[in-house]
Amino acid sequence: MATKGGRDKIKLESTAGTGHFYTTTKNKKTMPEKMSIIKFDPKARKHVEYKEMKLK
């Protein structure tokens, strides 16, 4: 049986205001700051910045 890791689920939400988001995991011990990454937004049909938000 797998053990629980130190990774937490997070939501990366588009800053374009389309409401599109990606979910991923990150290790909060090695990366305590909020994640920001440029990914493709299919609703805006261009690459935009995605910022980490709370996963409800």
Swiss-Prot record:
An example molecular function term from Gene Ontology annotations: structural constituent of ribosome
Highest taxon of the lineage: Bacteria
PROSITE patterns: RIBOSOMAL_L33 (PS00582)
Biased composition, class Polar residues, residue ranges: 15-24
Residue ranges of the region described as Disordered: 1-24
Record keywords: Ribonucleoprotein, Ribosomal protein
Gene Ontology terms: biological process: translation
Name the UniProt record assigns to this protein: Large ribosomal subunit protein bL33
Organism for this UniProt entry: Paracidovorax citrulli (strain AAC00-1)
Source organism phylogeny: Bacteria, Pseudomonadati, Pseudomonadota, Betaproteobacteria, Burkholderiales
